[in-house]
Amino acid sequence: MLVKDNKNIDFGYKIVKKKDKQNLVNNVFNSVADKYDLMNDITSFGIHREWKNNLINWMAPQKNQKLADIAGGTGDIARKFLNNGGHSAYVIDINEEMIKSGKVNKKNLKNIEWLVASAEDIPIDDNTFERATMGFGLRNVTNRAQALKEVYRILKPGGRFICLEFSHVENELIEEIYNFWSFKCMPYIGEKVAGDRSAYTYLVESIRQFPTQPELSEMFSEAGFSRVKYRNLSNGIVSLHSGWKL
């Protein structure tokens, strides 16, 4: 990882001021919001849908449960939660363009609310939700420790949080292939489909800067979560991290 201090943080492979990172991330998602779901399908060969299904299957939604989908973007995970037995969902995202895109694509979905807000300062009362998720969003948060504490705060006692995030591949051969696809192909596709090569260069770089699976598990524990576990999917290309508020 790059060397950082109290005033600086990584933005991909660049070091930027902490106060500037959120605006830089917003610019990335403002640029690609209307093509975000399409690009997910193309760059993952549609496998991102199965990763999200794995999250929902591990969570096993119940009809009395309300979900907070933090950094929820266009609402894919919230939709799956509702379609698999959950009662209602809030999609919380700091980027208004992503929320707008989600509202258009999920306009016929009932029991869903949309909220523009930072994961580091969620304007929701303590002990509100039975379940919380974050899919491919924690990498983009400036203060990840604070975001995890906020998730813990808004969960009810007995509540559960599952985070789906790009992680670190453990097989050397798969890692070599994955690196070629990530660094050579994804930015090119981003340029041709979404009109923004730099956004997908940032995406690839931010994945490599993200904590390892054991490191993120430790962050969960430090935020207060109990029974912390993780599962690797696709040989560690992504992982699911689970923690409970007990």
Model regions and ranges:
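Conserved alpha-helix/loop element of class I SAM-dependent methyltransferases that forms part
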Residues: S31, K35, S44-Q65, K80
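C-terminal alpha-helical "lid/dimerization" subdomain adjacent to the S-adenosyl-L-methionine
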Residues: L24, I92-I94, L164, H168-M219, ...
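Core SAM-dependent methyltransferase catalytic element
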Residues: S217, A223-L246
